[in-house]
């Protein structure tokens, strides 16, 4: 959440990797106020599978375990990062729409969270922007 660590030489990685780095660094700058807000790491007995931070009406949640339910708050905009090895996450929270993106920022889909529990298709290493409606 705070400081990125880039442990590769940018001139020695493929362009697709550099594109991913550029995208995530720009996204980190965009979400700086959220990243600097207090962190809440959940379920220490499960090795913190969910970490979240919120600033005003924007929240960021990172999910590290595909077996977790991502509980959405009342934030207007929530960024849900998929740090698991699967292509979908189970979300709890209705009346929201989402747009998912891959790790380079390319849109991969849209969906609605119409039921209290809904699966969202989010690429591994990607994220979704959830908007309350």
Which role fits each region the language model picked out?
Residues 1-125, 131-132:
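Active-site-proximal substrate-binding groove within the catalytic cores of carbohydrate-active enzymes
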């Amino acid at each position: 959440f705070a400081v990125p660590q880039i442990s590769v030489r940018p001139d020695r990685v493929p362009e697709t990797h550099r594109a991913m780095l550029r995208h995530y660094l720009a996204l980190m700058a965009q979400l700086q106020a959220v990243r600097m807000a207090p962190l809440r790491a959940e379920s220490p007995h499960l090795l913190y599978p969910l970490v979240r931070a919120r600033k005003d009406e924007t929240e960021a949640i990172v999910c590290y375990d595909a077996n977790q339910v991502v509980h959405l708050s009342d934030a207007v905009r929530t960024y849900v990062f998929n740090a698991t090895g699967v292509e979908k996450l189970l979300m709890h929270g209705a009346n929201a729409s989402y747009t998912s993106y891959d790790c380079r920022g390319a849109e991969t889909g849209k969906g609605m969270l119409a039921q209290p529990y809904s699966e969202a298709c989010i690429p591994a290493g990607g994220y979704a922007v959830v908007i309350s409606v």
